[in-house]
From Swiss-Prot:
Key words of the record: Chloride channel impairing toxin, Disulfide bond, Ion channel impairing toxin, Neurotoxin, Secreted, Toxin
Disulfide bonds: 3-24, 6-11, 17-41, 45-57, 58-63
Name of the protein in question: Micrurotoxin 1
Function: Allosteric modulator of the GABA(A) receptor (GABR), possibly increasing receptor affinity for the agonist, thus enhancing receptor opening and macroscopic desensitization. In vivo, intracerebroventricular injection into mice results in periods of reduced basal activity, followed by bursts of intense seizures and death.
Lineage: Eukaryota, Metazoa, Chordata, Craniata, Vertebrata
UniProt organism field: Micrurus mipartitus
Cell compartments where the protein resides: Secreted
Length: 64
């Protein structure tokens, strides 16, 4: 599986997930500097946090 890995709206970077991590993840939240984005590979989809504005977990290449 290959997942996007950069903290920008448009993300050209991706990486192959290590063994045991078969989910692509994207989380967005608001800070005083504006919207923040986190993208990476995970083993389990995390819970929706109280400050999150969106949370995406998917299992296709570069789906996050």
């Amino acid at each position: 599986l290959t997942c996007k890995t950069c903290p920008f709206t448009t993300c050209p970077n991706s990486e192959s997930c290590p063994g045991g991590q078969s989910i692509c993840y994207q989380r967005k939240w608001e800070e005083h500097r504006g919207e923040r984005i986190e993208r990476r590979c995970v083993a389990n989809c995390p819970a929706f946090g109280s400050h999150d504005t969106s949370l995406l977990c998917c299992t296709r290449d570069n789906c996050n």
